Amino acid sequence: MRKNFFKKVLAVTLASTMAFSMVGCGNSDSKSEGKKDDGTITLNVWHQWSNDTNELKGRYEEAVKAYEKDNPNVKIKTETLDTEAYKTKINAEFAGDAKGIDVFYWWGAGTAKKLVDAGKVMALDDYLTDDVKSRMVEGSTSAFEYDGKLYSTPMFSWYMTLFCNKTLFDKAGAKLPETYDELVDAVKKLKTLDGVTPLAAGAKDGWNAAFVYQALALREVGATGVNEMLSGKKEFGDEGYKKAAQKSIRLIQIRSFGENPLEQGNDDANAAFENGKAAMRIMGSWFANNVYTDEAATINPEEVVALKIPMISDGNGESTDYCGGYVESFWVNNNTKYKEEAAKFCIYINEKMGVASYETGSGFSGWTTKADESKLNPLFIQIKDLLAEGK
């Protein structure tokens, strides 16, 4: 099981080109709704906020209602799936012509490049007004730019974080880890607590497993090296990637993730941490919102501390390097019948959800649009302070 876990970490990491953002096949049988006799059109929009407890899903629905009110000739039909199922479905749809999709949630940089190269997504340059351009945060669009064209606008950025349950650390007599060696030492002490997994991995969902390796690779190679690899300037052959793999194996060998890490997915790992059954979780900044809003959680949010990914003493990474950035957004299917309407909604929903992500303590908006900071939770503010130290 441990060997299979590592294989999954490495396979997912390579398949997604490590998905750092610092920096299926088959034919679709989906059908577009088309234009009605009264001139109303329906845009089919897909995203991966499928959980009703996710505040962003609610904010998306509010934004859609507002858009339909202001644009009575446009109706929005939404399809949602959990992240892994969503990725599989989208890839299958775009193996064909994806006629049943007008606007969809996706990931930029290397992930979207395959769709761009295949002519599957539409550039938005013709629909970007000077006013829209002026509201986008400087430096927030690089993951959406290909060959001088902009294929999406930013939504929000995120920050990979090590979340720690300080109460469990105190019970185990463990130090909050600032280095990899301290992380290993903490794992050994946390294992003495009955019924507690030192680090919840959620490895049944591949992207969760990949996060562990990505975190270590960032510290071994450094942000500059990783970005050079992602941009094609360097091969995936730096010795640091091998060292990160070896450190991942060591964490598996000392049972950091429990006895059978492949049995738990993302939701299981989140629940384990939120209910005091796991002492650590490596996750994006959006998890801060989960800790405060998940009704099933029993943990006291004040027990949780947000930390940087631990440093590696002889690695090339710097303490200001971080994994995250602006990479997730909505895109337009190049095969849509309603290019102008789809582009306008895409730009609109990216801005609305960017602001919503910040106001809910999930991410950092890619827009200068004023946001309400009055309800930001203390854990998210900790992450905000960590981000301010980053590059």
Model-flagged regions — what are they?
Residues R2-N27:
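Sec-dependent N-terminal signal peptides of Gram-positive bacterial secreted proteins and lipoproteins
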Residues A11, C25-K113, D117-A118, L176, ...:
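Conserved N-terminal structural module of periplasmic/extracytoplasmic solute-binding proteins
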Residues D70, K171, I254, E295-G361:
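Extracytoplasmic/periplasmic substrate-recognition and gating elements
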Residues W107-M160, V184, V212, G240, ...:
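Hinge/lid segment of periplasmic solute-binding proteins
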Residues A123-M136, K175, A203, E220-K243, ...:
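Short, solvent-exposed loop/beta-turn-alpha elements that line the ligand-binding surface or hinge
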Residues D147, Y151-M155, M160, V184-K233:
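Extracytoplasmic/periplasmic solute-binding protein
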Residues V187-K189, L230-P261:
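Glycine-centered hinge/linker elements that transmit conformational signals in sensory
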Residues V304-M311, Y358-K391:
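Long, aromatic- and glycine/proline-rich binding clefts that accommodate carbohydrate-like moieties
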